[in-house]
Amino acid sequence: MKTFTAKPETVKRDWYVVDATGKTLGRLATELARRLRGKHKAEYTPHVDTGDYIIVLNADKVAVTGNKCTDKVYYHHTGHIGGIKQATFEEMIARRPERVIEIAVKGMLPKGPLGRAMFRKLKVYAGNEHNHAAQQPQVLDI
């Protein structure tokens, strides 16, 4: 018996919607990364994108444990000399709550073209509304 290898054109991708209200950031991100990668499927193949599309709602209501609300710091660089910028978790949630989940999930996906393709299937929204009703997403309880 030969080893099964999924073909990109035959992979069936479903759409799921997840409510992030009250969920712990890291635990939510690990499950999202696992499903984006396709590891929950029997036909998982490491070098093929077999994951599903995931819509995350209420990103502004995601929780962190301990003092991470004030202690967790996100850094980015503008590209100019002395251009390192930082923001705490509270500031990120106030400014762009979607980025908190996106950064957490992106760090858990493979680096390179395959990881970028997987990351494109993640849709994160701060509020309770999304514009993917045509895809008929199923509710996923994490």
UniProtKB/Swiss-Prot annotation:
Protein name: Large ribosomal subunit protein uL13
Domain of life: Bacteria
GO molecular function, one term: mRNA binding
GO biological process, one term: translation
Pfam families: Ribosomal_L13
Quaternary structure annotation from Swiss-Prot or TrEMBL: Part of the 50S ribosomal subunit.
NCBIfam families per the UniProt record, alphabetical: rplM_bact
Record keywords, A-Z: Ribonucleoprotein, Ribosomal protein
CDD domains membership: Ribosomal_L13 (cd00392)
InterPro entries per record: Ribosomal_uL13, Ribosomal_uL13_bac-type, Ribosomal_uL13_CS, Ribosomal_uL13_sf
